[in-house]
Amino acid sequence: MPKRHRLLLAGAVALLLLGSGLPVSRALYAAHDTMVSADPADATPHVVDGKVDAILPMGNRIYVGGSFTQVRNANESRVITRRGLFALDPATNKVDETFVADFDVNPDRTQDRGVKALAAAPGNNELFVGGEFGTLNGAAARKLVKLNAVNGALDPTFDVSVSAAVKDLVVNGSRLFLAGDFTSVGGQARGGLAAVDAGSGALDGAVDIAFTVPRQGNEPRVETIAVTPDGTTLVAGGNFTVVGGQARWQVALVDVVSRPAKVIDWQTDRFDDRDLGQSRCASAFDSHPRDVDVSPDGAYFVMVTTGAYTSRGSLCDIASRWETSARGSGLQPTWVDYSGGDSFTAVAITGAAVYVGGHSRWLNNPKSDGSNQSATPGPGSVTREGIAALDPASGLPLPWNPGRERGEGAWAIASTPDGLWVGSDTDKIGGWTGAGCEGCEFHQKLAFFPLAGGAAAGQPQPIGLPAELLSVGPAGLVKRSFDGAALGAPVALGAGGDGSRVRGAFWLGGLLYEGRDDGRLLRWSYDGTTFGNSEQVDLRGLPASHQTYNAIVVGFPVADVTGMFYDRGRLYYTLAGDRRLYYRYFLSQPNIADVVVGSQVLVASGEGDALDWSRVQGMTAAGGAIFWSEGADLRRVDFADGRPRPGSVST
């Protein structure tokens, strides 16, 4: 027998769907089913100076790279000299003193010199090290080397000359992809991206795509790369605007299976700020992408940026999700989370969460104070100091909130089956609030958050049919069976608050959310028989009307809503007398204080698609369709990829 779900119809009628189930994905690095604990492990080693730029879990060791020169074990005063790279045993949390690989790094932050990237060689017996360095253990070794994973000895059979700094490394099958400032690899021209044989170091002639014409300055650069788990697609971000002769402003996708490799038909204008005038991103940054990661199932990637936030559609100081399979030009992100003016520097996706690090103070903050390059908390913003976990569906901040002394940023985040490692340039993480350090934890430049003790994450999946349709009126809730075509007999439930004041409602994960005529958003728990006490959702200062600041629309006119429904991280709604169907991102959580209403307002329909949503009297979505009440009629339209399909309306 098909499983029954619940839909709700509110306002004159309000439709809600109730369902369950969280997305499950295959591991790319180390996938998790929950968030990690917000309490970092107590005994991880300290990095005394410099900063951590790279973390590589491999075999039974964790390798840490950066610009440091000294490390020490927790609860020990003895300092161990390690220049740019060390290994630790995660079983004991002690530095592995048998592994020695000292590079000519500089812990001075004004000198961009050190180990920037690490990657595991096939077999996990060796590792690749890339960066800006010239010697290893006193002998010449420039930009890229391969080391023994046990003792750090150089593998002399792997000898690849690289003309300038290596910024990122990815091993895919038998190939090592490298990205950076270079113009040649192995004596042959390569502009920012190259591939070599992971065993011999021989240059792969199939990967010869030039990244050229910098956004700013004279030197194009590929800053960050990631490859999908199936090995077909490479995502690149950096200081370039032309890739393989095609316009690609700072972000590009490359088909690395084809021989030769070719630029994929994936193009967006959202990283192009040329036409924004005074709202361009800050000239102090030649490019904006700082890190990218691909989801464990390969379906999407998240790019994080710097650049000084200016709104007007620019993607500076943001985290944004993009679908890997999308094709065409003028593509738009699935979601964007704005810090309001603080940089993001690292990202790692575990399936349960998207972890981002930087020197951010807030998330869900597209408005700031409306002035260029001014970082302030705007309406709807959520405080997150230096590190955060985002909901993969909506991009909104999950409750995970350890707090980190911000510094310049968290530069490396890496997941393992047991948890999450974070590398940075500061010494306090866990309990940090930004207002002081009473009770915060001391972990110099490196911390580990165990998976044990982490809370569940994720939101309910879309609802199928048949379902239960619940209408809200003066007498409370009335339930009917609904298969998408026919309604069953009404059954009065007589609960759910004063239905005459409801303006829109929706079911989500065992909870009934209702928008009221006084502008409040309330919710009740409901187990199918009994309602709990009402709770009020904190709108965090969102205006009671739509307001535009620097081309970003914020505000939530709850009192004017005529219908609502939830679908995959988005809350859709209609307004009285308005022909548009709006949406905003929405995060439901068990604790009412952790519920987040997205600040930014977006339009799904009603602008140029011949659909008119001004007469809605309650709505819901189920089985790939939107259902709404209009007068005496119950109407439907096909709903896919987050938008209704014009031409499919029926009554």
What kind of region is each of these model predictions?
Residues 2-27:
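Secretory targeting and sorting signals
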Residues 302, 466-473, 511-515, 570-574, ...:
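Short beta-strand elements that form the blades of beta-propeller/WD-repeat-like
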Residues 596-606, 650-651:
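Contiguous ligand/interfacial binding patches
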